[in-house]
Amino acid sequence: MLVLPGAATTDRRLNVTSNLASSSGTKEADALRIPNAVRATVDPVLEWIDGFCTEHLDDEYARLSAKMAAKLARKRPSPLLRGDGRIWAASIVYTVGQVNFLNDPSLTPHLTTDQFSAASGVPKSTLANKARLIRDTLNTGQFDPDFCRRDLLARNPMAWMIEVNGLVVDARMLPPELQAEARRRGLIPDLDALG
């Protein structure tokens, strides 16, 4: 937990473009803070992610998947440098889907694992193995605020928990000025900024 009053914090979120298709590869990579050393490898991964999400999912999945790809690209050494870029791209989107319950038919968009595998052309076992590697590498899981869709983030109670004077509280119950400060420090989601 991060302490609200007087504590130095780091921003957990990236400022990425909401529509990847409207950006050039270089601008997109700059916005995502992708190191130059891996840019040539990551650009095709981002293109695949954008195409797949445009055809089968939505812009929000594309944005979150690009954010996850960028985070993997910044790891030393980047796991994206080993293996097939198409498999990495599909596995990244699949992992973001796991964080956001993509296989839940009550949510939109929705794809079962079989549908995802068929659409991506990557076997289910490969998707599952790479997704586990990605989750372990990034220490992520379901409802992770960094990769959670806006509609799920609003309902995720853990995204709103912060420590104030040693007491863990739901930030939505704080006075507006403290909520604004928590948002400014990146301690709680800024749903307006997410679109």
How should each PLM-predicted stretch be described?
Residues 2-6, 15-87, 97-195:
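Basic, alpha-helical nucleic-acid-binding regions used in initiation and control of genome expression
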